[in-house]
């Protein structure tokens, strides 16, 4: 396979920056939105002025920059994918992504059940005490991971409900799935990995297709596509899979709304509240498309009456994959919880994916 990421020193540097940007941008959007996740737009404006949020603000406990389960699960996705890439390199065989990501999600579940690292844990994300915070994790993620389902990496994506929480399409699938687009240069492969791993917790096809679509968008962005171009390519990929219609309709609505210009929180709310996967994805894409700057896009993605941390996280993933970490507002980023660990994990993933 001709891997563009290794074609030149410049390409390698760009790829590394986009991996860092995607993960740090997601954490930044998450931190912006977490403080207002359960607030209505009217409440946000009453508390922060007519423009709503214009910066990171303290959460209910007075702390600025905290991240939620969105960033936590994203980081454990990275840990699973990094292990899979290392296994493929050392043993010369692939195909373990779904099992290793599932194992990583099991470790995240452990962080939600314990007050801190167990005695003797000295490495990996399980050693990071800040990740043991319980920040309103999704019920489907918790109940799904209490089961033992490991998706078959070769299973066809038929549009049929998966065996775990078959009626659930909550945004817990999509908010954790950007790393699949960073770990493999082929968007269709990233799409399939993300969609299958989403089925560890959510069985509704819209839930797992939205996860696949974000992974595909990120994969295209790392290659230098525009946000619009990456979204259009993801739509073409979605169209090859039965049961894609709800996810595709949400993305098309985001594109159409962005084409109108004049962004506003009221227009964001025409896309939904973001509690379900396709709405969260559509809001993240819309905010990234319709604005002219990274800060404005992130703020638009969280100023609404819905799941602001998830929509902010998705928007941040997209913006960071497009612009790299250098394009993120560093004054804001400096306030984000765990940023040094996130950056180091991003560099580890990029390094592993670049090794022969």
Positions of the model-derived regions?
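Structured, active/binding-site neighborhoods that engage oxygen-rich ligands
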Residues: 1-356
């Amino acid at each position: 396979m001709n891997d563009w990421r290794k074609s030149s020193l410049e390409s390698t540097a760009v790829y590394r920056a986009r991996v860092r940007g995607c993960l740090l941008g997601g954490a930044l959007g998450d931190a912006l939105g977490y403080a207002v996740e359960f607030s209505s737009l009217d409440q946000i404006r009453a508390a922060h002025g007519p423009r709503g949020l214009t910066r990171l603000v303290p959460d209910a406990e007075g702390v600025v920059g905290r991240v939620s389960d969105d960033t936590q699960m994203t980081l454990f996705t990275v840990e699973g994918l990094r292990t899979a890439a290392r296994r493929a390199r050392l043993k010369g065989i692939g195909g373990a992504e779904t099992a290793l990501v599932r194992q990583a999600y099991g470790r995240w579940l452990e962080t939600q059940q314990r007050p801190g690292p167990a005695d003797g844990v000295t490495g990996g994300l399980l050693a990071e005490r800040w990740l043991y915070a319980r920040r309103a994790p999704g019920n489907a993620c918790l109940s799904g991971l209490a089961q033992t389902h490991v998706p078959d990496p070769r299973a066809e994506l038929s549009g049929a409900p998966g065996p775990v929480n078959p009626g659930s399409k909550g945004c817990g699938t999509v908010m954790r799935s950007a790393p699949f687009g960073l770990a493999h240069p082929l968007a269709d492969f990233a799409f399939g990995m993300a969609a299958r791993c989403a089925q560890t917790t959510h069985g509704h096809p819209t839930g797992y297709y939205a996860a696949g679509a974000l992974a595909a968008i990120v994969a295209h962005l790392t290659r230098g596509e525009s946000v619009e171009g990456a979204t259009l390519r993801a739509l073409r990929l979605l169209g090859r899979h039965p049961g894609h219609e709800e996810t595709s309709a949400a993305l098309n609505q985001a594109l159409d709304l962005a084409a109108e210009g004049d962004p506003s929180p009221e227009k964001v709310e025409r896309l939904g509240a973001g509690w379900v996967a396709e709405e969260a994805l559509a809001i993240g894409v819309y905010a990234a498309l319709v604005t002219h700057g990274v800060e404005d896009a992130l703020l638009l993605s969280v100023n609404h009456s819905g799941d602001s941390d998830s929509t902010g996280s998705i928007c941040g993933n997209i913006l960071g994959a497009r612009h790299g970490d250098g394009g993120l507002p560093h004054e804001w980023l400096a306030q984000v919880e765990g940023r040094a660990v996130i950056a180091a994990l991003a560099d580890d993933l990029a390094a592993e994916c670049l090794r022969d």
